Amino acid sequence: MRATWEEKREPASLARWDPTPLEIVRGMLELAKVDSQDIVYDLGCGDARILFMAVKEFDAQKAVGYEIRQDLCEDSRKEIQHQSLQKRISVIKGNFLDADICEASVITLYLFPTANEILRPKLEKETRFGTRVISHDYPIETWQIAETEVCSGGTLYLYITPQAFQSSSSNDTKNDE
C-alpha cells in the first residue's frame, strides 16, 4: 500500500539522524566547490556539522540548516553562539519541505530515497539557476548527475540546476540543432 502525501511528509519517514562523517562532509563541500560567494543550505542538518564546516573551512558567506528535532536545533544553536557565528550560520526548526530555499547556491542532502523523491519537485521549482545539489548515498531519481564521487563512506552525487532535471532526450535534440 502506497503512503499518502501527508504520511510521506512525516519527518521520521524522510530521514533519521545519522551524523555524516567529517571526511564525507568535506568531500560534499569540495565536490560542490563551496567558496566565499556561496550560501549553503543543509536540509535535515542534524548537529549542523555541514554548516560549521562550510563556514569555517570553506569560507561560505552563509549557511542555513533546517532540522525537525528540537534537541538538535537547541544544541546546534548553542554551539553557533559559543563560536560567535550567529551572523553566518542559522538553524531553523522546521520541516525542510516547508523551507524557503530560493537563496541557496548549494544544497546538501543525506536523506532517504523517498525524501529525495518528495523533495525533487520543490528543488525543481524553487532553486535558482546554477544551484549545486549534493546528495550523499542516494541519487535523485530522473535527474542527470553532473559528477559522482565514490569515497570510503559512500557515494556523493552532484547535480547542477536546471540542467539536472532536463531529460537526456531534450539535450540530444538541442545538440542536433
Q: Residue locations for each model-derived region?
A:
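Conserved SAM-binding loop of SAM-dependent methyltransferases across substrates and taxa
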Residues: 49-60
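Conserved class I S-adenosyl-L-methionine
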Residues: 37-46
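Conserved short alpha-helix immediately C-terminal to the canonical SAM/SAH-binding motif I
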Residues: 69-72
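C-terminal substrate-binding/active-site "lid" region of AdoMet-derived donor-dependent transferases
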Residues: 114-177
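A short SAM/SAH-binding and catalytic strip from SAM-dependent methyltransferases
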Residues: 102-118
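Conserved SAM-binding motif I beta-strand of class I
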Residues: 62-67
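S-adenosyl-L-methionine
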Residues: 1-38, 74-103
